[in-house]
């Protein structure tokens, strides 16, 4: 979208008071219209959502209520109340966003014949541990094991479910884990929401989500599971129970049982097992070593695939498509303030994450073409900045002197 004086003139014809145009974005307003939100939400709700979204695309943003207030005619406490306890239908935005993600990804699969990937993982939004005397500590924050940091990390744990096809990657759900329901059950519930994809499709996950319950639920929805596997899982070669790591040690005495395969320019020795696991029948398990670390126990990686028709290379190539969710987490922390927001209530946090997901969606698909998040983020930032320049220009033309101009735009 190119912002011009003509598009600005169209915007000003909407009877938005001149003093409020500095806190308005016609680009973001048009996104609300596409989602039919303007018919369901009051002007108050639309204005609060717009203030938060504008803030996200302004340089220096770190998720604080003061950031929102800078782009709103309301006090920061008013916006905090809107997130934490305001009465508005946030499930409407969540459901509308989910339907749009499904439509885009499934349409791409039907058009190209390429698989839909449902990708699941979790991350920690790190927070400072409050004093034991804190009167109002952040809700639903706990210590979680951070595999990235290799230690316990205090904060909110988010379970993300993304849908991907042919390079288009969109966030479908971003769920706050609060120990009232297991992460396995969270993912299982989301899986049940998904319509059957139009082509052969796959659920991609790390070893924490490879469970019989999840595998079976996704199978019913039309997704085969491809996931990492812990090396202590039990296999049944020739009907005998054996740990995966023990079997790998026996097989890796010689290279003859392994094939050398190349994935993304890197070489691996891979052994292909087909058979049963505990609670899982007739699956493929790949034992993998980097070419230069063959036979080393700490270098062993294992992968499960429930589609036995796939070749070894196809399994590994598909599993690599799980990586965008890691990139998504980094983008949320670097650009969307996932690690730095200051919101206390669980409801406010869930609502902020929903708005954050909407911002990510806009960056990927709403700038005139499907593009990487970073590209879309900078495009929208430029659009909003140009809109502000045009607003200031219009205000200056309407004011008789500098003092009246300051009163309007301050």
Q: What are the roles of these predicted feature ranges?
A:
Residues 79-82, 119, 158, 208, ...:
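Long, contiguous hydrophobic alpha-helical segments, chiefly transmembrane helices and signal peptides
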